[in-house]
């Protein structure tokens, strides 16, 4: 297959964000590209790298790390010893399971400029996220990068779900129709794989999976773990009513009386006096703490809209947060 069809990270790297998320179709070459990049950085500049997986068993075959990319570097010796990577006899990088990040706190990595975290979004049949996973990755980044500027962490995943601990932690709500969602210090890239998918559909395996849920993820970069039920942009005639803050995320609640629908959105009126929260962790000035939603008119209406099927959510991330909110309210 033509090399130009595979993933090229250069545009993503040009944005120079410290934290990058790349979510692309399976087989498009994300992992391959993010092996080649740090190897090149070491050969040219002596910059080391760290390869991260979630748990130790996922590194059981790390001895094969260089196998697929060795052809790109015929004049260099690429060797793995334990969980260390060597290039031309020099230490180039480490493989680290995120689950043991605490054991890395006393280690120093002054020459590491790149962390690559592969499969950062858990797939259905894989192991669970580790407890406080985002904090674990941030602790590892802090240990490795310290206060250096020319550093970056690149997290890779297949198209599973935009609802994951990382996007929730940083309040990132990507537009899945845009290739690059760029924030102050982070970036989400959802590569366009149309040409790659067209060619892969011509293969025997591509024909086998075409039209299946697996094919939607592998060929079309569709987020198969996300439900589109009740996902709908709010109408232009909807009016803002109140806000509710949950886990640091502010949700705006809007109503369209003509359509008889209620919408939950990130958009809200920051000057409103109708701001509610369910936890003391979120409680702040000019908010009302609600311990029983049945005692509050607005939250009763929100719960009723949800239970009767006329509540809509702006996107999957908002939907997921709202569902957690309803579980907190003991509405199942």
UniProtKB/Swiss-Prot annotation:
Q: Where is this region: ATPase?
A: 1-207
In this entry, which stretches build a coiled coil? none
**Which reactions is this enzyme annotated as catalysing?**
ATP + H2O = ADP + phosphate + H(+)
Which SUPFAM superfamilies did the record assign? P-loop containing nucleoside triphosphate hydrolases
Q: Where is this region: DNA-binding?
A: 233-332
According to UniProt, the name of this protein is: DNA packaging protein
Role noted for this protein: ATPase required for the genome encapsidation reaction. Part of the active packaging motor via the binding to the packaging RNA (pRNA), itself fixed to the head-tail connector at the unique portal vertex of the prohead. Binds and supercoils the pre-formed, unit-length DNA bound to gp3 to produce an initiation complex for DNA packaging. Provides the energy to actively pump the viral DNA into the prohead. Approximately one molecule of ATP is used in the packaging of 2 bp of viral DNA.
